[in-house]
Amino acid sequence: MSGVVRVKPGVEFAVIAPGGFELLAAITLAASSLGYDLTITSGTDGVHSGPNDPHHRGEAYDVRSHDLPDPAVALQQIQLHLIDLERFFAFIEDPGTDNEHIHCQVKKGTTYP
């Protein structure tokens, strides 16, 4: 069985920057490789670190980790499929808390393409 990308109800994609498309591609390829679904829990919606937060620019996405068999393996697969680790990164944010998730974004201070 092949995994797919799902979206939590209410998540918005008001804008998707070129870097955002690359992130979505990496998440999609990771889900397919893992053989289980990955759920995006935040796009351009929600409260983040301010108006210039990469989420609001369509350059960052959060992926649910609580329901994954091994979040570290999912993270590794997303990182494996990112085209350029010099300009993109992903990590497990707030590990061990109710807010734990995989955060993926265009690196701060970089431009893609």
PLM features per residue range, with description:
Residues 1-10:
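N-terminal, Lys/Arg- and Ser/Thr-rich interaction peptides
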Residues 8-9, 26-35, 69-75:
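A generic short-segment signal for beta-strand/edge and adjacent turn/coil regions
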Residues 10-18, 48-113:
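Catalytic cores and adjacent binding grooves of peptidoglycan-active enzymes
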